[in-house]
């Protein structure tokens, strides 16, 4: 404990000083931290401070510095006024539900408010921070580079689980917390064992969501970076993220990983990329499953059953039950995992059984009015995204709008079953991407395009000319006697 304080306090002070000197640094540091924050919180158990590290080290200091010293930068944000008004209405409903008689634990209610609202302002900060194409490229480079660690760790955990043993591998990584981060070593039989993999996170949903999200981010990166080496790295990371998403242990990624890529490729409408992924995507997926020892036909059969069963047995019944039983809501925190963890047995007994779907959760905590405003926000963001993409003509910019729009669409569909929008790290990245989306129409990629052209010209100049090129060159050069 003393050693942790001896190291942690100076580190926290250094982070806060860096944010104080330039608030944008806080966003970059936050992006580097989120792939490891929840995993670090696991090692800090039973100390509850671990789950708040991200907020107290980065999010709250960024907000404080921005509001107190840099509010003039708020004028740079490009979030449309109708969406901002919806945010205000949603925040009012969330705060109002704090006074719901169903909220018996004030701390649990505060956690519920934090989960619903804390990260939405990141959309404004991202929109105010990304003023040039170079700013976006810097953010994408950091995100792609740091993603190598959790993706490789996740694949290593799957490989070791298949060879050394699942419990042995997870215990090696997480010690006494191994059972907690793997849902008591849960696995599925699909010709071979299909393991729940947490990687550097605290459970599989976070890691699977991260791998899924990185498909959109690496697609953007490979489309806009002027450096050929970075573009190649981003392409490799796209494939790595796809494989990691498939082997994360989340069966829903058998559907959502290919679906996200298909939506992005369809929106981007680059025929060469579409052809490559339509040809190689199924091959990569089949090879990944076979290499892992999984039966392709068993996976397809179970995935089909999973989709139909989730709809008929879980998603629709949860929505209907929530609408019928809790039209006015039970109060914030009543269906939030972090809030329920600190409640007493008596408090939990008075609450409904928790549901997985984001929309059903909204009904339970915020009632029908909360669900309506939430759907208005998500639907409006999606409509704006499609509109921005439709009017964007510049190829680099269009690839970015395609990736973000595709991600927004998939998250909206995913939210019928899961809570990804409120889980690390998507609770941060969803709003960052929304902010970037609304900034994109004003970004100019002229310098990036010119830098790429110059790099390609230099590359061609260094290449040894072919025999035909040398012959043609000799014919063009006049000879004097």
Segments (PLM) and residue ranges:
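Alpha-helical transmembrane segments of multi-pass inner-membrane proteins
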Residues: 12-14, 91, 95-99, 140-168, ...
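Membrane-interface helix-loop-helix junctions at transmembrane boundaries of multi-pass membrane enzymes
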Residues: 17-27, 67-85, 219-236, 270-275, ...
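N-terminal hydrophobic segments of proteins, predominantly signal-anchor/transmembrane helices
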Residues: 20-45, 55-120, 411
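Long extracytoplasmic/lumenal interhelical loops at the membrane interface
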Residues: 36-37, 45, 292-366, 385-392
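Transmembrane alpha-helices of multi-pass inner-membrane enzymes
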Residues: 65, 216, 261, 273, ...
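A membrane-periplasm/extracellular boundary helix in multi-pass inner-membrane enzymes
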Residues: 152, 156-164, 243-248, 265-307, ...
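A conserved mid-to-late transmembrane alpha helix and its immediate loop/hinge
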Residues: 195-205, 349-385
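Hydrophobic transmembrane alpha-helices and their immediate junctions
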Residues: 241, 258, 262, 366-412
């Amino acid at each position: 404990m003393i050693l942790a304080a001896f190291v942690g306090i100076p580190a926290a002070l250094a982070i806060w000083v860096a944010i104080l000197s330039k608030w944008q640094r806080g966003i970059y540091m936050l992006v580097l931290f989120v792939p490891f924050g929840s995993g670090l919180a696991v090692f800090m158990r039973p100390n509850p401070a671990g789950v708040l590290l991200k907020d107290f080290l980065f999010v709250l200091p960024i907000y404080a510095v921005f509001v107190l010293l840099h509010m003039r930068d708020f004028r740079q944000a490009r979030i449309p006024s109708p969406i901002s008004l919806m945010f205000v209405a949603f925040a009012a409903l969330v705060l109002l539900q704090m006074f719901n008689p169903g909220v018996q634990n004030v701390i649990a209610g505060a956690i519920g408010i934090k989960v619903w609202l804390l990260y939405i302002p990141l959309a404004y900060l991202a929109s105010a921070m990304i003023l040039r194409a170079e700013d976006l490229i810097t953010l994408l480079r950091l995100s792609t580079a740091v993603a190598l660690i959790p993706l490789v760790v996740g694949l290593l955990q799957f490989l070791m689980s298949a060879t050394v043993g699942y419990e042995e591998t997870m215990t090696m990584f997480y010690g006494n917390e191994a059972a907690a981060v793997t849902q008591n070593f849960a696995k599925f039989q699909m010709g071979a064992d299909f393991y729940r993999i947490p990687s550097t996170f605290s459970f599989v949903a976070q890691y699977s969501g991260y791998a899924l999200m990185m498909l959109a981010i690496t697609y953007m990166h490979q489309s806009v970076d002027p450096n050929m080496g970075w573009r190649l790295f981003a392409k490799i990371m796209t494939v790595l993220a796809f494989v990691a998403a498939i082997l994360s242990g989340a069966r829903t990624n058998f559907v959502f990983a290919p679906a996200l890529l298909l939506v992005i490729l369809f929106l981007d409408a680059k025929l060469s990329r579409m052809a490559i992924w339509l040809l190689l995507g199924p091959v990569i997926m089949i090879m990944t499953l076979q290499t892992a020892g999984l039966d392709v036909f068993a996976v397809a059969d179970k995935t089909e059953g999973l989709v139909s069963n989730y709809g008929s047995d879980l998603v629709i019944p949860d929505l209907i039950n929530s609408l019928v039983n809790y039209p006015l809501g039970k109060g914030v925190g009543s269906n939030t995992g972090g809030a329920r963890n600190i409640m007493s047995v008596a408090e939990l007994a008075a609450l409904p059984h928790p549901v997985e779907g984001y929309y059903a959760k909204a009904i339970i905590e915020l009632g029908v009015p909360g669900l309506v405003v939430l759907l208005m926000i998500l639907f409006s963001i999606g409509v704006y995204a499609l509109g921005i993409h439709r009017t964007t003509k510049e190829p680099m910019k269009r690839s970015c709008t395609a990736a973000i729009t595709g991600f927004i669409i998939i998250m909206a569909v995913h939210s019928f079953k899961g809570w990804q929008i409120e889980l690390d790290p998507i609770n941060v990245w969803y709003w960052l991407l929304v902010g970037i989306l609304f900034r994109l129409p004003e970004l100019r990629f002229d310098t990036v395009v010119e830098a790429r052209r110059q790099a390609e010209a230099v590359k061609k100049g260094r290449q040894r000319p072919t025999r035909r090129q040398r012959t043609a060159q000799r014919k063009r050069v006049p000879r004097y006697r």
